[in-house]
């Protein structure tokens, strides 16, 4: 994918905290639009000389994987961003939890956001998923309302 500014596989970091265990994100395009794909910065250097990333991704066989930073950025539309370190677990424990989930299947209810929260032992939530579902519900409700209004108007006209 990529963009004119960030070709596929570009590894560009925004300023921030990039120690091991930190949550990182990169904007990617999905069927529902652009989302922030999140992962955990690991303690190993890949052959690309960047830290590896543990993430739960549909693009990698619908499972939790540990990839090079270059692979993590392969579908990115922009730079890597540090999302911080939300929990109290030490980095070793976060990485141990993350690696214990390798090959765990991706599910809508266990996506990349749920995964990074779980690894940090904080409530596993997905604000992006909640936002998408809320939008879908509103659009659906509005569509149903318009349909119902159209049916009512149609009936009025047919009785005249």
Regions found by a protein language model. Name each.
Residues 28-30, 102-107, 149:
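Short helix-to-loop capping/linker segments positioned immediately adjacent to catalytic or ligand/cofactor-binding
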Residues 106-123:
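Active-site nucleophilic cysteine motif
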